[in-house]
Amino acid sequence: MIIWSRQDIQIGICEKENMKALLVIDIQKSYITKYETDIVQRINERIMESKKAQYDIVYIKNTKKLRSGMVTDEFADDLILASDHVFCKKQADAFSSEELISYLNSKHISEIEMIGVDGNSCIKASAKGAVKCGFIVSIVLNCIGVSNLPRFEKTKEDLEKIGVILK
């Protein structure tokens, strides 16, 4: 039995089995152009592999205003949508969404694999949030968009220190 909490506030108790989820984070039109041209293709391949392995596929959208003032929450045109499990966030950490946490616990998810953008912000914050909630977390490095590679080296070290698995 795992008691999970968010910021020292007990949210619930959940019996967890060894179920897995793939979190696809921020693969949106407004973000994806900043990264390698084949990032969506690699993400799509991982989505299909995860679907075949019976992972629960979950999409995370950032709905906060961009620095430019623009709000854009449309997925990238060529992103494969393998499920209708979509959760919105207005903070870097996807686990700031109680709805996401409740959904994952209702599905008895214990392990989370993350792919998406950006490795130094939303992926990092979401990985830390997931660990705080008691999930086993892994990040698939070839499916992570990173705009500042030197900084990402430090990010990877920080994530490994808290138990995040880098694949």
Which positions does each model-derived feature cover?
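Active-site acidic carboxylates
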Residues: I2-Q91, I101-S102, S106-K107, V164-I165
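Short beta->alpha junction loops
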Residues: F87-D93, N142-G145
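Short, well-ordered alpha-helical microsegments
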Residues: S96-S97, C122-K124
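Short acidic/polar active-site loop segments enriched in Thr and Asp
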Residues: S110
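A short glycine-rich beta-strand->turn/loop micro-motif centered on a GG-aromatic cluster
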Residues: E113-G116, F135-L149
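Short Gly/Thr/Asp-enriched flexible loops that form oxyanion-binding sites at enzyme active sites
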Residues: I123-C133
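Active-site-proximal loop->helix
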Residues: N148-K161
